[in-house]
Amino acid sequence: MARVKGGVVSRKRRKRVLKLAKGYYGAKHILFRTAKEQVMNSYYYAYRDRRQRKRDFRKLWITRINAAARMNGLSYSQLMHGLKLAEVEVNRKMLADLAVNDAAAFTVLADAAKEKLGK
């Protein structure tokens, strides 16, 4: 039986890693060992930052809602509490969109919150 050395498989594996490392800076897209390390790190960063992105967007929405709420004489927490008392079920993403693109509609919601808070 002939001896199998596995050159084809190794080349295919290395080629796959180097293809994933395409566009990386310096030796990280040329040398197999550094490319492999960087690809592994990239997978880690992608996994971590998919979760981070959710936190970042929520933070952005809250900042936008707070700015619009203060233009209407309320703080963010007062607005959210007032909306809960008024039984208005609008999520933060929708509120932030209203704050940026439809100030009149946001003002209506802020007035409803003020009314329930007794302001």
UniProtKB/Swiss-Prot annotation:
Belongs to the bacterial ribosomal protein bL20 family. The gene is rplT. Signal peptide: none annotated. This is Large ribosomal subunit protein bL20. Binds directly to 23S ribosomal RNA and is necessary for the in vitro assembly process of the 50S ribosomal subunit. It is not involved in the protein synthesizing functions of that subunit. HAMAP family: Ribosomal_bL20. Keywords: Ribonucleoprotein, Ribosomal protein, RNA-binding, rRNA-binding. The keyword Ribonucleoprotein applies. The keyword RNA-binding applies. CDD domains: Ribosomal_L20 (cd07026). It comes from the Bacteria. One of its GO terms (biological process) is ribosomal large subunit assembly. Disulfide bonds: none annotated.
